[in-house]
Design a protein with these regions (language model features):
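Residues on the solvent-exposed faces and adjacent turns
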Residues: 26, 73, 108
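Transmembrane beta-barrel outer-membrane domains
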Residues: 41-43, 83, 110
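Outer-membrane beta-barrel domain signature
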Residues: 37-41, 79, 104-106
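Short, hydrophobic/aromatic-rich segments at coil-to-beta transitions
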Residues: 1-2, 21-25, 68, 97-105
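Short helix-loop boundary/capping segments
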Residues: 62-102
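Extended terminal
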Residues: 85-165
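N-terminal beta-strand/beta-hairpin edge segment
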Residues: 1-43, 47-55
């Protein structure tokens, strides 16, 4: 599978397992985050890319992912002007020995918004826990914009989301 549309690109080997799951192997993608604005009120700029040895999808849920997602030149595109955030990476791996579920470790490569945290998903639920520190995390307008999902603290804010599919 290979597709290029503008600055966006997707490449992967696609297979279908007898249990109904779809598997992408040797997968890579590049997406400009501006594309997301067509679907979500996401005020984030930058280049999103990923490389995966494998991604397994069953009944619409990612059941296994081995790879990395990177956000380069991340920018909060605020009405008052763009706020540079930085470069980030999420390393994904299998959640357990049965390879059912995925965990991700978020880290900051460089930037004025320092993010660290974990993500996990199974067939039925997900959990996201992120800590944000640094100068941008203490910026009042940015904190206000994040207040829908974030809990302020002395150093910045925390995001803790859990849910079921």
């Amino acid at each position: 599978l290979s597709s290029v549309w503008g600055q966006q690109a997707l490449r992967a080997q696609l297979s279908y397992r007898p249990d109904g799951s779809i598997v992408l192997q040797d997968a890579a993608f590049t997406v400009n985050t501006q594309l997301f604005k067509a679907f979500f009120p996401l005020y984030l700029g930058g280049a999103l890319s990923g490389e995966f040895a494998q991604i397994a999808i069953n009944e619409g849920h990612v059941t296994n992912a081995e790879g990395v997602v990177r956000l380069r030149r991340g920018v909060w595109t605020a009405r008052s002007g763009n706020i540079p955030l930085g470069d980030y990476q999420i390393d994904f791996s299998s959640a357990d020995s049965a390879a059912v579920g995925t965990v991700g470790a978020l880290k900051t490569i460089t930037g004025s918004l320092e993010l660290s945290g974990n993500l996990s998903s199974t067939l039925t639920d997900y959990q996201i826990a992120v800590e944000a520190t640094g100068p941008v995390a203490r910026d009042e307008s940015f904190r206000q914009a994040m207040s829908i999902i974030a809990i302020p603290n002395q150093d910045g804010f925390s995001v803790s989301l859990t849910g079921q599919y």
